[in-house]
Curated annotation (Swiss-Prot):
Organism expressing this protein natively: Pectobacterium carotovorum subsp. carotovorum (strain PC1)
GO molecular function, one term: fluoride channel activity
Function statement: Fluoride-specific ion channel. Important for reducing fluoride concentration in the cell, thus reducing its toxicity.
Catalysed reaction, written as an equation: fluoride(in) = fluoride(out)
Keyword field contains Transmembrane helix: yes
Record membrane topology: Multi-pass membrane protein
Regulation of its function: Na(+) is not transported, but it plays an essential structural role and its presence is essential for fluoride channel function.
Pfam families associated with the record: CRCB (PF02537)
Stored InterPro entries: FluC
GO cellular component, one term: plasma membrane
Transmembrane segments: 4-24, 35-55, 71-91, 103-123
Name the record gives this protein: Fluoride-specific ion channel FluC
Gene Ontology BP annotations: cellular detoxification of fluoride
Amino acid sequence: MFSTLLAVFIGGGVGSVARWQLGVKFNNLYPTLPLGTLLANLIGAFVIGGALAFFLRHPHLDQDWKILITTGLCGGLTTFSTFSAEVIMFLQSGQLAAAGLHVLLNLAGSLLMTALAFALVTWVTTH
């Protein structure tokens, strides 16, 4: 149990610091697109897609490694709450196009990145 908590703690800490840094470096570049949030979600989606494919092909790996990457790292890196708050702020300020673009890029982009990474890792590990 302690090793699992430690895995979540370490992965979550690394992911959260990475998300914070992405926000600091990129969120102010485009006023109508919080790029740091988008990058955090797209990178996290790619990592979890690749991890899912990898772990499916390596079921013998210790569960704590899976939890460190998925629940910890990806959970700390990605941010549905910040994304949701940004959409609401766009809507409150009447920026409907920015809100719609943010929703489209984050949701569709994250799904595409997850699928892309899953397919890529599957292809690499079977060839």
